[in-house]
């Protein structure tokens, strides 16, 4: 797992404070991205997902909109929904804080970076098939399992995931292109 270590990726234990965890974190994404192609309007998807969560659990929901798709006031339509605005990281062009709290029970993210980041930080994630967290996540279409999510071994997945990211130095040396051409 030297690749993951090189990138500073370290798995946190699965939900270490499970007796205190309570929040469902629902993450939006940029609805103009290719990852969202063929999906319903983002507002409808978020609304439908909140309704699906409410059918299976009374846990409070933390709504994290994507910075480029804020969906204003959506959280006011539902009980026990807290909007958490994106926090831009200083000194970056376009990076936002992707932290998770010890009180987070599970994360729902169709295919944004929040899915893999949740898995790395020990939070079960419910994701779509196009998510990089799919292999170790829970199926987003099975939210009825949100009270008992799977939490599989993640070591091999982390190693594989680490090969989807490259440092600036590696990019300048042409390593990603060299690696990709071996797959052709």
What are these regions (language model features)?
Residues 51-54, 59, 67-121:
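Donor nucleotide-activated moiety binding/catalytic core segment of transferases
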Residues 36, 97, 119-121, 135-143:
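Short, charged, surface-exposed secondary-structure boundary motifs
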Residues 11-13, 47-48, 93-95:
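A generic local structural motif
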Residues 19-75:
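Conserved catalytic-core segment of nucleotide-activated headgroup transferases in glycan assembly
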Residues 1-21, 135-184:
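Leloir-type glycosyltransferase catalytic cores
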Residues 4-10, 114-116, 121-128:
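A structural signal for the main folded, soluble domain(s) of proteins
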Residues 93, 111-115, 125-137:
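Short glycine/proline-centered loop/turn elements that form peptide/ligand docking sites
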């Amino acid at each position: 797992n030297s690749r993951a270590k090189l990138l500073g990726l370290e798995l946190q234990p699965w939900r270490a404070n499970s007796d205190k965890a309570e929040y469902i974190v629902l993450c939006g994404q940029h609805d103009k991205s290719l990852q969202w192609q063929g999906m319903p309007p983002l507002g409808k998807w978020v609304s439908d997902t909140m309704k699906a969560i409410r059918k299976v659990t009374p846990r409070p929901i933390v709504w994290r909109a994507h910075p480029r798709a804020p969906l204003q006031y959506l959280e006011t339509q539902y009980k026990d929904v807290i909007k958490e605005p994106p926090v831009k990281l200083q000194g970056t062009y376009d990076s936002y804080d992707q932290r998770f709290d010890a009180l987070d029970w599970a994360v729902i993210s169709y295919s944004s970076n929040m899915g893999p980041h949740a898995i790395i930080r020990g939070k079960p994630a419910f994701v779509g098939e196009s998510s990089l967290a799919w292999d170790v996540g829970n199926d987003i279409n099975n939210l009825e399992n949100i009270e008992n999510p799977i939490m599989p071994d993640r070591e091999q997945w982390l190693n594989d995931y680490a090969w989807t990211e490259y440092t600036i130095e590696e990019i300048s040396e042409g390593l990603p292109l060299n690696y990709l051409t071996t797959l052709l």
